Amino acid sequence: MSLIIDSHAHVVVPPESYKFMAELAANRANPSLGVPKLSDETVRKAGQSIIDIMDKVGTDIQFLSPRPYMQMHSVKPGKVTALWTKHMNDLVYQTVQMFPTRFRAVAGLPQYRDTCPSNTLAELEFRVKEQGFIGCLLNPDPTEGDSLPPPGLGDPFWYPLYEKLCELDIPALIHSAGSCSPRESYTLKFINEESIAIISLLESEVFKRFPTLKLIVPH
C-alpha cells in the first residue's frame, strides 16, 4: 500500500510563540531572555489540529517546517532571526517527537539579509545530525525586498550551503519569506523568487559542481 506524503507543510504556531515573536520584534533581542520552551500540551494541541485535517483528506505523512513568511530574515539585528529560527525549529522538533508516525522535520535556516549563508550551517548540522531533520527551507532573498538582495541561487555566494546540503545528503525546499515591498505581497513573492531561482540555477554551473544537490521548488 502506497503512502500519501505532503512534502510541503508548516507548523501551527501557538499563541505563546506569537507572544515571543512580538517581544523579539519589540526589544530586538536586547536584552535577550533566551528561547522559551513550549509545554507538551501546547504542542500536542497544535499538532493534533494538523492531523485532524490530514485524516480528513487522506494524508499519511507531512514534512513540517516553520511558516516561511514569519521567518523574520530581514529584522535587525541578526540575533532576532537566530533566536526566532531556533524557537521555530524547536517547535517543529517537539511536534515530530510527539507524533513520530505522522510528521518529519524540515528546518528553517537563520538566514539574515545579505549575510553569507555559511552563518546557517551550525544550526542546520545540529538539527540534521542530532535531531534527525530531513531537509531545510532555503530563502533566495533574506532581505525580504527591503534592500538589494543576494545574488541568484546560481551564484557562488550560495556554495557553502550547497556543500553542506550535499555532505548531509538532504534536500532544500526553495521558499521565500516575507515581503517589505508595497507592490509585492508575500504570496506573490513566493512565486517570483522561485521563478528567479529556477532561471538562475539553469544558467549556472551549480549542478555540474554539485551533482548530488537536491532542491525542491514547491510553488
What does each model-identified segment do?
Residues 1-219:
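Helix-coil boundary/capping segments in enzymes
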